[in-house]
């Protein structure tokens, strides 16, 4: 009888052990999913990782864009393909085909100004895996958290690369095109339909300015895409409609406070890039005002 009790007890223990192991393995993919690249907290300002999309300074070299981002109070920078590297090397550009030496020079300049590169785009991602891999290798080399694209047709390749490289992808929106009804990226409902059943590291690069140019309210769009915001090109525009232009935050119609509140409510941990597409030759004062607005708003909220 004692032997029978011991056998029964052993079977119970083994079942419990096996259940525990099964539970651990079931949770493993979720743990891996949550392991996507995190921007170090030291680069946070006012509760957000705020900086510039280098395209803001596309009249200048990357080195100058880095300097101007730091001068404006930014802590992070988002790269775009094709920008000249420096005044000393005007024939050298930064993109995913650049040489290792060029990439190292860019990394050194970014580190010199105590910034961190977080994103790259807007750039096309090919369906061909070998070609797509060049982009993800570049992102890994530069230590980026994400790539920004509009290549919806390459979604299967993108998802495979995201899983392999643990690098996020944000689908960007440009304004609604009256002469091209096939363009649907402006519509957050369409974008949600593209990403909702895909890896959680695939989502939206929320360009709030282009939503305003499409006569959409950014806060409403963010709510539609709740939980799938990878990054944001944050803008405040002077009016709703396709001809609108950038204004310093708080002086336009985009409801920047509402946008920040919604991003905070969603637990957003991506980068906010100022992509200021106005006053191109002398935008640093305006950009600094935008960054100061975000920093001050977050500090007042104790985020």
Stretch-by-stretch model annotation:
Residues 7-21:
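Bacterial N-terminal signal peptides that target proteins for export
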Residues 15, 35-54, 58-76, 191-206, ...:
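Histidine-acidic metal/acid-base catalytic patches
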Residues 22-31:
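Bacterial N-terminal signal peptides
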Residues 29, 36-37, 103-104, 109-206, ...:
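Active-site acidic/histidine proton-transfer and metal-coordination neighborhood
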Residues 55-59, 83-86, 122-127, 153-155, ...:
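Solvent-exposed loop/turn segments at secondary-structure junctions
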Residues 78, 119, 148, 170, ...:
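Conserved beta-strand positions in the central sheet of alpha/beta enzyme cores
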Residues 79-105:
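Glycine-rich, proline-tolerant flexible connector loops at the mouths of alpha/beta enzymes
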